[in-house]
Amino acid sequence: MNQKTLKALEYDKIVEILKNMAKSTPAKEYFENLIPSTNLADIENELNKVDEGYRYVLKYGNPPTLEFENILPSLKKSKLGATLNPHEILQIGKVLKLSYEMRSYLSYTQDFSFLESMKKRLVNLKEVISRIDQTFLTADEILDTASPRLKEIRDRIRKLESRIRDELNSMIRDPKIQRFLQEPIITIRGEKLLLPVKAEFRNEVKGIVHDQSATGATLFVEPFVCVEISNQIRILKSQEKEEIERILQEISSLIASYCDEIETSFYALVELDIVFTKAIWAKEMNASKPVINTSGIINLKKARHPLIQKDKVVPIDIHLGKDFDVLIITGPNTGGKTVTLKTVGLFCLLCQSGIFIPADEDSQLCIFQKIFADIGDDQSIVQSLSTFSAHMKNIIEITKNADDKTLVLLDEIGAGTDPEEGAALAKAILKYLSEKGSKVIATTHYGELKIFAQQEDRFENASCEFDVKTLKPTYRLLIGIPGRSNALVISSNLGLDKGIVEMARGYLSQKTIDLDRIINEMEQKRKEAEENLELARKLKLEAQALKAAYEEEKKRFETERERIRKKAINEAKEIVERAQYEIENLFKDLRKLAENLKEKEVLKELEEKKREYERLIQSISQQEKQEAESKTKKTLQNIRLGQKVYVRSFDAVGFVESLPDSKGNLTVQIGIMKLNVNISDIEEVEEGEKKVYQTTSKNVKLREKSVDLSIDVRGKTSDDAILDVDKYLDDAYTSGLRQVTIIHGKGTGVLRQAIRNFLKRHPLVKSFRDGTYGEGEQGVTIVELRD
């Protein structure tokens, strides 16, 4: 990959962004020197690393800030036994701390093989970290805690310095001495504490003169009383320096003992910084890992140039190498042709550098050994074209080096010279590159190349869409449709006299008019196809939504039906258990009574009645067993139209309306409903067979005691009373009662009339009448239920 191509495709701008995003000095150097690879294994390996980093960042957030310098020279020094300076030691300490933080961040790498391997290379040297932390506050300040000896020396220095201050303060407070001083203050020259003495009183303050003012009027004197103390401090300062040197040597030796582990950890951090920088950029750009191939196929979906603002970039779909090898793009200036070239070329470079591309996940790219781009002299996305000579100089180099593993991008091929000669040259160059096996994308204004692309094998036309109504490009790439100049339409829309426009149209050749008409028809058909595709997509989504709603409703119905069934069985069990308990107690009492009366026949009859009740009690369990068995019956093998069948999922009997299809689906009519069911969901119903959903007489008898013979609705409104009566009649009928009493009172007769109007329409009511004397007369209604 030559530097001219990298710059023309603005690859350098992307790596500069990544360099600035990287935190460590080595990672920044990596991006500064990053160039695309041509080795398939290396590219796939790098993309897989970034993919792990990308997925990990999405799931667990961004990593710690990996800001550190290159510590390899310092590690080499420590290996040789040299003493490291504080800055070098602190940088090594930073790497060790970041290793610890990164290990913690990478706590969930079980499903991330690369990150797991990196985590294992990160050392946890708490001993070294602790030693560095207790030694340094900054690179310029070593703590007293660095060693007991250092603390002792510094404590002595501080005490002596305090003595000097006390002596000097005593002197400046002395009235006899104050008159010899310029000011009653202590001044510092170098590391000495001195008094500012007036020059004329030099001999009045005994001491050593260390400095004087610029005018010579003030002498800075160290009194003799402080000199001895200062000498002691000087000796201690020398000892302090020696102790610090010893501490630095000690820490350097400690680092040297772990040099290999630290170096391994350093390299792991650098690689992690690189990978996570690429991953975070991919997240910000909504980029994805491209699918790699070696067959020369490019298929980009929703590709977005990363240097165009997100709110302005228009995604493009472009493919090359499968059905055609040369794509000729035509269209207006600033319509997106150059952006398309740069997008394809840049994406190939990014992919071969192990960087995700801002496109849909299933986008494909080929690994090219060479990529050439002729896009003008340092032309940015919307700058003017280069000269003909500059174009030809680049194209000559391209034709000499192109082969079947080459991608060639040519912007405005043949431009800058006579149109006829330029078009001829363009045809020859494109034909030559096609015969070499290169993959080529070229932009042009020449109409002849549109026809050329239609005639040549493995060539295809494309255009950048232009809205003649708004007079603006849409930046959409339309493959298979050559571009139109739109000059006459645009001129007319801008207000050019219609006569001039028609005159210009008359100057067009018939060939040009026919071509323009064909292109227009193709574009209309494309728009119709897009509209139909969009309509089909919407209809598909609606159908999927309806299907999902149906499935959800069916599931809800089945769940509710099962809940009601289980509830009914549980209620029946409770009634049975309660009845069993009452029966047991009753028989105990009767047995005692019979024994006392010595009536063996009575006792025998009671025992028989008990056995009968026990048989009744087992009916619920028998019903459950029958229901379970019904679900395991074999499905029908031979089905005929009109056959009576039981549909399990609806718990109902119906009739076959249509025979099963190849998938076993058929239509069954249940009542007024026609349902599509599967053959596995139905079973045969023989004549006289009673399904488990039919109520048996035994079960009815068991529930007789649970429903009263009458219901009292006095004092209620007509609506509330009717609701209660309706439920009561259902319960009474289910329990086997055939005559019940509704107590509504006499009153005004409104409630009685409302109830009787309701009873006239009730399907369970056979007849009803007033109560007789002793039954409640007109205050009640006696209801006879159907069998």
Swiss-Prot record:
Xref: InterPro entries: DNA_mismatch_repair_MutS_C (IPR000432), DNA_mismatch_repair_MutS_core (IPR007696), DNA_mismatch_repair_MutS_sf (IPR036187), MSSS (IPR046893), MutS (IPR045076), MutS2 (IPR005747), P-loop_NTPase (IPR027417), Smr_dom (IPR002625)
SMART domains (UniProt xref): MUTSac, MUTSd, SMR
Disulphides: none
EC number: 3.1.-.-, 3.6.4.-
Presence of keyword rRNA-binding: yes
Pfam families membership: MSSS (PF20297), MutS_V (PF00488), Smr (PF01713)
Transmembrane regions listed in the UniProt entry: none
Binding site for ATP: 331-338
Coiled coil regions, renumbered to chain: none
Keywords: ATP-binding, DNA-binding, Endonuclease, Hydrolase, Nuclease, Nucleotide-binding, RNA-binding, rRNA-binding
Cited CDD domains: ABC_MutS2, ATP-synt_Fo_b
Residue span, Smr domain: 711-786
GO molecular function, one term: ATP binding
Enzyme class, UniProt record, top EC level: hydrolase
Tree of life domain: Bacteria
Secreted as UniProt keyword: no
Biological process terms in GO annotation: mismatch repair; negative regulation of DNA recombination; rescue of stalled ribosome
Functional summary from the UniProt entry: Endonuclease that is involved in the suppression of homologous recombination and thus may have a key role in the control of bacterial genetic diversity.
Annotated PANTHER family: OS10G0509000 PROTEIN, OS10G0509000 PROTEIN-RELATED
Subunit-level organization: Homodimer. Binds to stalled ribosomes, contacting rRNA.
Family: Belongs to the DNA mismatch repair MutS family. MutS2 subfamily.
Protein known as: Endonuclease MutS2
Organism for this UniProt entry: Caldicellulosiruptor saccharolyticus (strain ATCC 43494 / DSM 8903 / Tp8T 6331)
The organism's taxonomic lineage, starting at the top: Bacteria, Bacillati, Bacillota, Bacillota incertae sedis, Caldicellulosiruptorales
